């Protein structure tokens, strides 16, 4: 089946009748954000809300109905009618004003495999439940996913693995201060298994005026850069597992000014086994700090005993200090400690304790809809061993799935008008399954009807 576009002009709800406006039976989610539960600097992205619906109907790399065709033009809400592995024959670049809703796929969902993807310049982007697995077929020295410039993006429930440079980087050019990545969130996602000899989680490097939020993510099986940070950063409710001797959270190591809110994260040491049988060992949770890096640190825990039980201790400021002797004088190096988060950082409304974040990630993190795939299940099995398992790999063939693994397919639900919303959903919520224009009408809660369908997928 070819890709389907459903274009219409969205209308605001005025409550007067049901002919031109969508009379909403949907929940009132409060403030209209990228989606309910969006947090941080990227929470106000609107994606393709004022555009058209595009349906991905083939796993082919290119052509009508492909993901590549879907993201080649702006102003689209992209849904999926197929499940399986999309093997990229070349890098994939995303346009502006897109909503990618991979949780709409049937079966086990979709995996984008075999090459890098770029969100550089993809302003106003919402990307959810997409698995990005580059692997050895991607070029050496390239990230699995990356952003060099662009603004107002949010990535939710992603799983990004097997980068040959970094896995997921947001890395601006300091020589271009007006073209920095800014207002970006990565949340509820897995970033892991960077490939040796350069196994890295990612660079999160902007300037002091351009914010990035990392909320409730799992960094796993990366030797270093989990992540490496410069600029304006929120790092809240993340779990780091099985990093190596390169570093966990790396604090800039530069004269550039940074401001970070680092709260309620859990650092858990794994086996640190390298693919070649060597033990890499793990660094301290925080490294390469100096006075130019200002940080509020609170509620962070560290479990390094590898006993299979989550029983870490709370980190203190002394865990972020280094003593040295220069010309007979003792020198203490540390970040500049803040007594509270800077007011510039957005409130995290879903703030949890570090242990609650661990439990939530185990149960819900990553590309968990429509179902966790074998790779993410493997990562969770490692994490929940709490020090008994873990591998820093050289190639995706080093893990039991031997690559992307098996992705179950299934038929997409019936959709008479081909608007991206199943008939069953339209019947249940009083929409017209013979009218493709109702997908993009704005409901009384401020979201389009098709967005409301997407939000209700469980």
Where are these regions (language model features)?
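Bacterial Sec-dependent N-terminal signal peptides
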Residues: 4-25
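Extracellular beta-strand-rich solenoid/capping regions of secreted or surface-exposed proteins
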Residues: 68-74, 85-101, 110-128, 134-150
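Extracellular calcium-associated, cysteine-rich motifs in secreted modular proteins
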Residues: 399-458
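Structural detector of coil-to-beta-strand junctions
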Residues: 116, 144-146, 166-167, 199-203, ...
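Extracellular beta-rich repeat passengers
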Residues: 229-400
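Acidic Gly/Asp/Thr-rich repetitive segments characteristic of extracellular carbohydrate-active
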Residues: 33-78
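Right-handed parallel beta-helix
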Residues: 97, 102, 123-134, 149-165, ...
């Amino acid at each position: 089946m070819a890709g389907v576009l459903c274009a219409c002009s969205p209308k605001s709800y005025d409550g007067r009748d049901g002919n031109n406006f969508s009379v909403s039976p949907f929940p009132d989610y409060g403030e209209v954000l990228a989606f309910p539960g969006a947090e941080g600097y990227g929470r106000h992205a609107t994606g393709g809300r004022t555009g058209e619906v595009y349906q991905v109907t083939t796993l082919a790399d290119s052509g009508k109905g492909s993901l590549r065709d879907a993201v080649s033009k702006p102003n689209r809400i992209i849904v999926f009618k197929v499940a399986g592995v999309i093997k990229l024959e070349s890098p994939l670049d995303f346009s502006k004003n897109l909503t990618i809703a991979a949780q709409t796929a049937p079966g086990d969902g979709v995996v984008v495999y075999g090459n890098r993807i770029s969100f550089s310049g993809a302003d106003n982007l919402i990307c959810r439940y997409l698995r990005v697995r580059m692997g050895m077929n991607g070029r050496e020295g390239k990230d699995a996913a990356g952003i060099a410039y662009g603004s107002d993006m949010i990535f939710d429930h992603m799983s990004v693995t097997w980068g040959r440079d970094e896995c997921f980087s947001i890395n601006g050019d300091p020589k271009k201060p007006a073209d920095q990545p800014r207002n970006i969130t990565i949340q509820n996602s897995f970033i892991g298994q960077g490939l040796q000899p350069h196994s890295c989680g990612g660079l999160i490097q902007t300037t002091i005026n351009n914010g990035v939020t990392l909320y409730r993510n799992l960094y796993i099986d990366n030797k270093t850069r989990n992540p490496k940070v410069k600029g304006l950063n929120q790092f809240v409710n993340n779990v780091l597992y099985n990093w190596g001797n390169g570093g966990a959270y790396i604090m800039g190591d530069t004269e550039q000014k940074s401001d970070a809110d680092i709260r309620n994260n859990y650092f858990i040491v794994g086996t640190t086994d390298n693919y070649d049988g060597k033990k890499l060992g793990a660094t301290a949770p925080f490294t390469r700090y100096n006075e130019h890096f200002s940080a509020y640190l609170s509620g962070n825990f560290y479990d390094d005993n590898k006993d299979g039980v989550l029983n870490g201790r709370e980190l203190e400021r002394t865990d972020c200090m280094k003593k040295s002797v220069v010309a007979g004088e003792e020198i203490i190096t540390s970040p500049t400690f803040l007594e509270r988060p800077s007011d510039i950082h957005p409130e995290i409304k879903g703030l949890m304790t570090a242990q609650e974040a661990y439990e939530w990630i185990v149960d819900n993190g990553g590309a968990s809809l429509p179902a966790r795939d074998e790779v993410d299940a493997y990562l969770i099995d490692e994490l929940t061993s709490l020090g008994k398992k873990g591998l820093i790999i050289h190639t995706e063939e080093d893990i039991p799935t031997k690559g992307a693994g098996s992705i179950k397919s299934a038929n997409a639900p019936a959709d008479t008008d081909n608007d991206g919303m199943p008939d069953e959903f339209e019947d249940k919520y009083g929409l017209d399954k013979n009218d493709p224009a109702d997908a993009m009408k704005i409901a009384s809660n401020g979201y389009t009807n098709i967005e409301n369908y997407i939000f209700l997928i469980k």
